[in-house]
């Protein structure tokens, strides 16, 4: 008899606990998926400092070739603007110098530039500064695009943007973002294959905000090799897409 009463009490207690959990569970809101929130998510804000000023004060000295490219092409004012709206894609030194996928190797067949002085490399007769200039303009959008949903509303869908490039074959860039809001450049089946084959690059670092919020910069990831972010060599005759 005692055993029966004990079991009955245990069963009653378990039923009560289950009932309480069921009702409390109704009040629980579903866990929210990852959502980009510019007020919370990591961003790097530099006040009135411009992109040009920041590049020259970078403590790791990673942008020697980027700085020299801007100087050689006379684009300092663009990178130094406090009032115009731009999105810049920046490249660290290995993106310029890696043999094979690096800029000098792909555009000019210029190898082994990593240990050379940037000024000396840009003054090499093999380097066409018009091509360098258009490449920097290609990596510049005349609007503000961060990794949030304002321009990139749907996951894994490439959105098309017009760059500032004057090269007839290299004026369009596509940008997509994955579930974690990592931006991917030119990974779109709609882009022509081009004479460099399928080339795309992930963004390694996002949302460096300059010029009182008028400009934003993103830095290409190295991804073992610095891949270029478009598929046609610069300076060639117009291609029929």
Curated annotation (Swiss-Prot):
**Endpoints of the signal sequence:** 1-25
Where in the cell is the protein located?
Cell outer membrane
**Which keywords accompany this UniProt record?**
Cell outer membrane, Lipoprotein, Membrane, Palmitate, Signal
Q: Does the keyword Signal apply?
A: yes
* Covalently lipidated residues, kind S-diacylglycerol cysteine: 26
Q: What induces it?
A: By ulvan and rhamnose.
Major place of localization? membrane
Membrane protein topology class: Lipid-anchor
Q: Residues bearing covalent lipid (N-palmitoyl cysteine)?
A: 26
Q: Give the record's GO CC terms.
A: cell outer membrane
Tell me the function of this protein: May be involved in ulvan degradation. Ulvan is the main polysaccharide component of the Ulvales (green seaweed) cell wall. It is composed of disaccharide building blocks comprising 3-sulfated rhamnose (Rha3S) linked to D-glucuronic acid (GlcA), L-iduronic acid (IduA), or D-xylose (Xyl).
Protein name as it appears in the record: Uncharacterized protein P37
